[in-house]
Each structure stands twice: as C-alpha cells, then as structure tokens.
C-alpha cells in the first residue's frame, strides 16, 4: 500500500482569491514547491483535492478548470514534482443538492484510496479550511496527520 499527501488547491497551493480559473489570477503560495518536493522525497504521492463550486455557479466551465489544472500541473512538473492526480468537486449544495465529493464529505479522498491502493492511516492532508480537515477525518486520516495551512 502507498501513502499520499492530500493537498487542497485554493488557499494552500495558490493564494485564494475566490473562484480562480485563469492562470493570470493564479499565484502559488510561498514554499509550496519545496513542501511538495519534501513529501515526494519521503515517498508520498501528491494528490490535489479541491472544491470548485464556481463550476456549478456558472463562473467558469469544466473546460476552464481543466485548462488551469493542466497549466498548474505543468508548473509543478517543471520543478521536478509530479502531481499524481487532481480530484475536484464541481457541485454546490444550493444548486446541485448534496453530493459525496464536496468537502467536508470524504468522497474525493476515498476515491483516491481506491484508485491508488493507499493506506489511509499513512496519508497526510493539508488544508486551509475546517472542511478540508473534516473530510480527512471522515475518510479515516489520523488526527495527527491533518495539517492546517495558514497563509
């Protein structure tokens, strides 16, 4: 079984400016590349989990999100860092009703556990909101492996 670093996007990988979908508005947080490199060197997969309610709200499309994601992954790759997978939830409860993927629900994490044969007890989650940490708890990530990231 493998171990992974689950990492939120807006507020952890990039400065959260609210519904970022253009690379011109995307600013990486200080130290994010070094942080990810450390975990890769320690044998972790890097998996991004991100709520993207802007899709449900019509602020941007799935295609817009995918283009920005491809660009973001490429920036990591240029630094020698592999992002194993980016999972996203395009829903918003006021528009789509409840779903199992929008954090604090653990759906994205549980899907990654299945997709990559992860040992959830060896995984770490870094998030900037309580909903991120709660998703980790609900998925079974130990409390000591939940890290609050404050930019």
Label each region the model flagged.
Residues 13-30, 55-64, 79-81, 91-100:
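Metal-dependent phosphoesterase signature
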Residues 3, 63, 67-84, 92-125, ...:
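Asp-based, Mg2+/Mn2+-dependent phosphohydrolase catalytic module
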């Amino acid at each position: 079984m493998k171990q992974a670093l689950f990492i939120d996007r807006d507020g952890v990988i990039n400065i959260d400016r609210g519904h970022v979908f253009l690379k011109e508005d995307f600013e990486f947080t200080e130290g994010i590349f070094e942080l990810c490199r450390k975990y890769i060197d320690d044998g972790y997969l890097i998996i991004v989990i991100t709520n993207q309610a802007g899709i449900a709200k019509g602020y941007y499309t799935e295609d817009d999100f995918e283009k920005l994601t491809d660009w973001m992954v490429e920036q990591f790759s240029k630094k020698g860092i592999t992002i194993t997978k980016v999972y996203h939830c395009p829903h918003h409860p006021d528009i789509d009703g409840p779903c199992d993927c929008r954090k604090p629900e653990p759906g994205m994490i549980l899907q990654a556990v299945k997709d990559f044969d992860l040992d959830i007890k060896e995984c770490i989650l870094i998030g900037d909101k309580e909903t991120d940490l709660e998703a980790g708890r609900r998925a079974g990530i130990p409390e000591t492996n939940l890290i609050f990231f404050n930019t």
